Amino acid sequence: PLVEGRYWMPWLTSNNHAPFLQTKTTLWQWLNVKFGARYDFINVRVPNYDVLRNKVTDPVVHVAGGSLRYNNVSFNVGVSYNKVAAFQPFVAYSQGFSIFDLGRTLRAAKADVLSKISTAPVKTNNYEIGAYSDINHWLQLSGSFFYTYSKLGSDLKIENGFWVVNRTPQKVYGVELSADARILPNLKAGANFSWFEGKLKSSTGKWDTYMSNISIPAAKLGMYVNYSPIENTYLQLQYVHTGKRNRFAPNASGVYNEGEGIVRRINLLNLMAGVKVKSWDFSLAVSNLLNYTYYTPASMLMARNAEYAHADGRNITLTVGFRY
């Protein structure tokens, strides 16, 4: 409970069981097929409770509790082909199931009986296609495209000062790429990139509304170089870049809604070094090597002056370990 007696959300008791079967087989030496099934049993007991009020003076809404029972079968299937090391394609399909943020839904209820509240679970259909490549054991590449659709969404939105679950249909799609190379026996380098986008179906039936920055992060690029000058030592330099996400306009008051603030670009360098001497391990890590000043993505997307906070500056950590 809060200090003045209001409950943040009702006290929930959940009992979950999920038997599953997962199989994998190889056909004709090169074709890999996997298949799985899962059955979820979820029983949530909800006591009688009061809806969370924005102010103590707001009228009290009493909700009669009860039990919420969920039963669901979900499947997954995947196929990959690895006869040619330089090009190994794969496709996959899976179903997801969750009772996402049930507490938020219940605490913001507008009905006085549990059975009248929309507590339907989130079910997703997930698709992925991609390929992996191994070129002479010195260069590994991978790339994939994914798409997820849900008839009932799980994005969050602000309503009367509280976060509530947006049940509008949603779709999320994106790409993931990675590359790793052994340039010399003691020198490696690599990079990875990820980009996501998510949209909601508006009342007009069009996919013209972006999901909030809480659910969809900005694009991210990571790069590294790892060098071992002598045996049992290493030096690694990392570069991390997060992109800009600016999908929303200020509201009528000229400010951004929470979760819709502009997320600006961030560039960081991190340095790590280590050496092993017999049973001793010594490592040095310097995060934010250039002491770059920036706000955390959480501060930027929330767009509330009171919660803007700088991220950590340069941070040096020395670790000593002994094995026996």
Describe each region flagged by the PLM.
Residues 82-100, 118-173, 178-182, 194, ...:
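Membrane-embedded beta-barrel scaffold of Gram-negative outer-membrane proteins
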Residues 29, 142-150, 166-252, 290, ...:
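Gram-negative outer-membrane beta-barrel transporters
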Residues 1-2, 45-54, 101-110, 153-161, ...:
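Outer-membrane beta-barrel translocator domains and adjoining extracellular loop/strand segments
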Residues 189, 232, 241-250, 274-324:
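C-terminal beta-signal and adjacent terminal beta-strands/loops
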Residues 33-37, 75, 89-91, 140-143, ...:
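Transmembrane beta-strands of outer-membrane beta-barrel proteins
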Residues 19-25, 77-81, 129-133, 175-181, ...:
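Residues on the lipid-exposed face of transmembrane beta-strands in outer-membrane beta-barrel proteins
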Residues 3-10, 22, 56-66, 111-118, ...:
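Extracellular loop and loop/strand-boundary signature of outer-membrane beta-barrel proteins
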Residues 1-84, 205-208:
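Signature of Gram-negative outer-membrane beta-barrel scaffolds
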